């Protein structure tokens, strides 16, 4: 290998080939991880790349090969404004990325149904798709399906709710434990010295984001507001009709409910319930996701605070992560923080 005494401001693959003393074809094979190159030669090429400070122009390389990225999002199929906003962001970004050789699509599957989610993952055409972003529960069947995607060379991102025990490449979403802690701080301050009970609405105990929010919520309520009793989670499955039916009985069974924490995104049933009932002393309410419905409820005093995450940021971040992983480029972690 030739010593590098020259300064290369913008090194090219020709420079790599010259310094490593190999052919351009060999450099191309190494850069694209293709077979047929000896380990010793790969080491020489990688050493030349490091010494020259070569940074691959992935966009130019993809354009030269006519490559198109194909990314699929799997979303829950529930009646939920937050999920609908994610879908709308996918549609809009798909239009914006047409010039960037990137195609986005989505699949909707039954919410909180791990078998349906696994079936949707398994149905993906591995030969046509580069990456998959999954918003769904963490179960053994889902982990197995993700492992199958990885075995076929696809990039996998968990979206909103993490699936850490799987082989997923990255999680795009907020820190849900911290979100639960924030909800407890807000609700505790709203309630002050009042004694009573707090009801926790959740979508499903299968949903890791809901579980993590509950964990953070309980931690702060127990430490900072021990005079308030936190009730067991009421599972509404993000179904507005079910939530509207469950709330009257739950409030009748538990006297002196002074606060409600809605840890899921399905707030329609909660809002409908409060709009149709009168309270001498309405419970304070903290919810998740700023949507047209929750914004109106905030303005009307039905909801007292909303903890939000930006749907557009979530989708854009998922796409950036999947592209970076496919191109083997480093991530800007600060940019992907939701």
Explain the meaning of each model-derived region.
Residues 56-119:
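Amphipathic helical "hinge" segments at domain boundaries
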Residues 183-224, 330-338:
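An alpha-beta-alpha
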Residues 1-67:
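N-terminal helix-turn-helix DNA-binding module of bacterial transcription factors
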Residues 132-148, 217, 234-293:
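Hydrophobic alpha-helical
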Residues 140-178, 291-299, 303:
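Flexible loop/hinge segments that line or gate small-molecule binding clefts
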Residues 96-100, 152, 221-228, 253, ...:
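Short helix-capping segments at alpha-helix termini
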Residues 76-84, 105-117, 138, 172-182, ...:
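Hinge/beta->alpha junction and helix N-cap segments in small-molecule ligand-binding domains
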Residues 221, 310-338:
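Hinge/cleft segment of the Venus flytrap/periplasmic-binding protein
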């Amino acid at each position: 290998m030739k010593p590098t005494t020259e300064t290369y401001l913008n090194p090219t693959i020709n420079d790599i080939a010259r310094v490593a003393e190999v052919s351009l074809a060999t450099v191309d094979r190494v850069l694209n991880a293709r077979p047929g190159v000896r380990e010793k030669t790969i080491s020489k090429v990688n050493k030349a790349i490091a010494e020259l400070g070569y940074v691959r122009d992935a966009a130019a390389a993809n354009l030269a090969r006519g490559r198109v990225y194909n990314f699929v999002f799997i979303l829950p199929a529930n009646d939920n404004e937050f999920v609908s906003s994610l879908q709308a962001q996918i549609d809009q970004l798909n239009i914006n990325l047409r010039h960037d050789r990137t195609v986005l699509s989505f699949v909707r599957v039954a919410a909180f149904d791990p078998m349906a989610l696994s079936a949707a993952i398994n149905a993906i055409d591995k030969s046509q798709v580069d990456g998959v972003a999954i918003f769904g529960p963490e179960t053994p069947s889902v982990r197995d399906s993700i492992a199958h995607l990885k075995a076929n060379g696809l990039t996998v991102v968990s979206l909103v709710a993490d699936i850490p025990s799987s082989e997923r490449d990255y999680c795009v979403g907020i820190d849900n434990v911290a979100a639960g802690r924030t909800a407890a701080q807000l609700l505790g301050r709203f309630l002050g010295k009042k004694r009573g009970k707090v009801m926790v609405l959740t979508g499903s105990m299968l949903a890791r984001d809901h579980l993590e929010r509950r964990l953070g919520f309980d931690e702060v309520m127990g430490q900072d507001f021990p005079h308030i009793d936190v009730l067991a989670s009421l599972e509404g499955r993000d179904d507005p009709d079910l939530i509207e039916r469950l709330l009257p009985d739950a409030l009748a069974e538990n006297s002196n409910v002074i606060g409600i924490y809605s840890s899921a995104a399905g707030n329609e049933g909660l809002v409908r319930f409060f709009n149709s009932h009168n309270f001498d002393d309405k419970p304070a309410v903290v919810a998740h996701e700023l949507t047209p419905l929750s914004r109106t409820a905030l303005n009307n005093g039905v909801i007292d605070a909303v903890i939000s995450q930006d749907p557009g940021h979530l989708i854009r971040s998922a796409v950036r992560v999947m592209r970076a992983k496919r191109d083997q480029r480093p991530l800007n972690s600060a940019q992907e923080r939701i």
